[in-house]
Amino acid sequence: MKITAVIALLFSLAAASPIPVADPGVVSVSKSYADFLRVYQSWNTFANPDRPNLKKREFEAAPAKTYADFLRAYQSWNTFVNPDRPNLKKREFEAAPEKSYADFLRAYHSWNTFVNPDRPNLKKREFEAAPAKTYADFLRAYQSWNTFVNPDRPNLKKRTEEDEENEEEDEEYYRFLQFYIMTVPENSTITDVNITAKFES
């Protein structure tokens, strides 16, 4: 009987006090970056004008750190001895063996076969040998710098008239290069060949 009376009382109270409904005309206040700066203008004092009773943070100013402090604390990557954190676990590792250029040549003595005695199970590179190219092939493919007609690459973009005009300005230099390639022996020095005299003639 008492339970029924309590339930009836609860229902009557719920009917007497309607649930408040949000007013559709009220718009939430938008916050801007200016509001953020106004409220949180200082991280040290945390003075908040909207919440004056908020407990402020009390702390000592952190000591300024310099590059000298960094070097003092982390003076060695190998031992990682840090005077500010003496209980920090040190890194344990074996020192890597020193490598010399002779070691490099021994391990990678051939780019074609890629035989590496230190890594015998390494997969070797398999490729077809590139066809040998001669100077005749070069002349056949690139017979003209002005038109750049390349029979091996017919769809290659050809040079424009503007390119040709620019190259006419350098014609003297190209003539020198042609003379040098055709007449100067390989491995010769400037004392062996009087380039200026031959070029002017």
From Swiss-Prot:
GO molecular function, one term: mating pheromone activity
Mod. after translation: Proteolytically cleaved by kpr, probably at the C-terminal side of dibasic Lys-Arg residues. Glycosylated. Most of the precursor molecules are glycosylated on at least one site, but only a small proportion are glycosylated on both sites.
CC terms in the record's Gene Ontology section: cell surface; extracellular region
Chain segments annotated as transmembrane: none
Propeptide: 21-31, 58-65, 92-99, 126-133, 160-201
Signal sequence bounds: 1-20
One of the GO biological process terms: positive regulation of pheromone response MAPK cascade
Subcellular localization(s) per the UniProt record: Secreted
Residues linked to a glycan: N187, N194
Keywords: Cell cycle, Cleavage on pair of basic residues, Glycoprotein, Pheromone, Repeat, Secreted, Signal
Main location: secreted
Role: In h- cells under nutritional starvation, P-factor induces alteration of cell morphology toward mating, arrest of the cell cycle at the G1 phase prior to the initiation of DNA synthesis and indirect transcriptional activation of the sxa2 gene which down-regulates the signaling pathway.
Domain remark text: The Pro-P-factor precursor carries 4 repetitive units. The second and fourth units generate the major form of the P-factor in the cell. The first and the third units encode slightly different peptides, the fate of which is unclear.
Name of the protein in its database record: Pro-P-factor
Organism per entry: Schizosaccharomyces pombe (strain 972 / ATCC 24843) (Fission yeast)
